[in-house]
Amino acid sequence: MERLLGDIPVELGVDFKKAVKEIPAQSGEGTVFEMNGNTFEKVLYTGMIDEFFDDCYGPLEYRSLRFESEELPDVDNFQGNAVVNYTERDVPFTRIIEHKFFEFGKDSETGEPVRGTIITREYPATWEKGMEPYYPVNNDQNNAIYEKYHALALEKKNVLFGGRLGLYKYFDMDKVIRASLDAAAEELGK
């Protein structure tokens, strides 16, 4: 990750609306964004689009998730894969993640197989303000509200809206990466 970002400053856990101010451009035309004494002509916003516009058309609905982790010291292989999805109606969780398979189950120092395992079950949760929004709720009512926000977004020439929350659209990860690369190519004229 460090090589990917290079010299790009990254700040985590920062509330965009509190940390970034939109101010008039020195040229007198349009606006720029200011953060920590630095100005930016354009920003990429991947947060909730309704929150960006201060919920002026009302809040959009989102789904959230909750996670329960369990350490299984006597089980070396719980499911044989990093992620197994569960789509059955009678199963309360949507997936189980077995973390050791992301690192191939080897101790980083010794290279020996790791004894035991840790799993995390992912459960759907109703989203409320203050919770992490994971997915948009794309129904007729929310999509109509989103279209109003989208019209405002098109007027903000110095903001690129992206991701599930910024575009209020469900994306699988491969699709969001493709959409991000396409948006970057369009923005950079390549």
Report each predicted region and the residues it spans:
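Active-site phosphate/pyrophosphate- and oxyanion-stabilizing loops and adjacent acidic/basic residues
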Residues: 2
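A conserved beta-strand/loop element that lines the FAD pocket in flavoprotein oxidoreductases
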Residues: 5-20
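Short, well-ordered alpha-helix to beta-strand connector turns
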Residues: 8, 40-41, 156
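Conserved beta-strand termini and adjacent loop/short-helix elements that scaffold enzyme active sites
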Residues: 11-15, 99, 162
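Mid-domain catalytic core of redox enzymes
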Residues: 21-152
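Short, solvent-exposed loop/turn segments at secondary-structure boundaries
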Residues: 57, 171-174
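Short FAD-binding loop at a beta-strand-to-alpha-helix junction that anchors the flavin cofactor
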Residues: 153-169, 176-180
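Internal hydrophobic alpha-helix adjacent to the cofactor/substrate pocket in enzyme cavities
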Residues: 177-190
